[in-house]
Amino acid sequence: RYIICGHTHMQGFVSDGKKKIINAGAVGVPLKSPKKTQYMILTSDGKDWKPEFLSLEYDVDTVIKEIHESGLWDASPYWCRITEHLLDTGELPHGTVLNHVMKLNDYQDPWYNIADSYWEKALDELGIR
């Protein structure tokens, strides 16, 4: 009767009258929720479960600073730039950017072998600094 999930990174509730799908959102990198973390509290009235969707601001600047300090930026600069943009704006998830990069590359190479020039062009076209 209930499906509770969170992998889409967006809070939401859908029902067809019989089944209810409840998405708690994302604590780390939510979509459409810049500089906020998301969670959900489920309460029961004894008959049904009701979701309460909550969002809290958190210190995104510290998270970004820690990404730089961890060395991850050096190992994966494009992933880090996309993540920073997503944390700041709530827009352009990694999959969307990856699809754009692969399209620019005419789907000729696997994602892990695509030249940096395609990544740079994609991030520039999408407005990711």
Describe the predicted segments one by one.
Residues 15-24, 28-129:
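Acidic, His/Gly-rich catalytic cores of divalent-metal-dependent hydrolytic chemistry
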Residues 11-13:
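Residue-level recognition of beta-strand microenvironments
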Residues 2-9, 21-25:
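Active-site neighborhood of phospho(di)ester-bond hydrolases with catalytic His/Asp-centered motifs
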Residues 1-2, 50:
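Short active-site oxyanion
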